[in-house]
Amino acid sequence: MNRVEPIFKITKSMQHLLNVEITNKNREQVIGMLQQKIEEREQILQDLTQPYSIEEEALGIEVVKLNQQIEMKMNVIFDQIKVELKLMKKKKKFNNSYTNPYQHVQSSDGYFMDNKK
């Protein structure tokens, strides 16, 4: 049996997982499953040793190509998360300005300091 075959299958399943439409509701599940598959693949990669057969090298090249596609899709997800975090921070700042509109004003108006003794 080809030693690279399990790595190829896991990588292919990762690609399939990322091809499914990722929404806000299922994003956390997809990321969790991806992490699990990455850990599985890493365990298999650690046990993999040289020399490689011609078949294994060809399959390895396919895995590298798939991995580049997976990485691009994961970067898109990461960018979406960053945009959402920025929007959440803006909303939080905007909502706080309504609850305490004078929070940013640091003045001592209305205080009387008596210097006499």
Curated annotation (Swiss-Prot):
One of its GO terms (cellular component) is cytosol. Keywords: Bacterial flagellum biogenesis, Chaperone, Cytoplasm. Signal peptide: none annotated. The keyword Transferase does not apply. It is found in: Cytoplasm, Cytosol. One of its GO terms (biological process) is bacterial-type flagellum organization. Homodimer. May act as an export chaperone for the filament capping protein FliD. Belongs to the bacillales FliT family. This is Flagellar protein FliT. It comes from Oceanobacillus iheyensis (strain DSM 14371 / CIP 107618 / JCM 11309 / KCTC 3954 / HTE831).
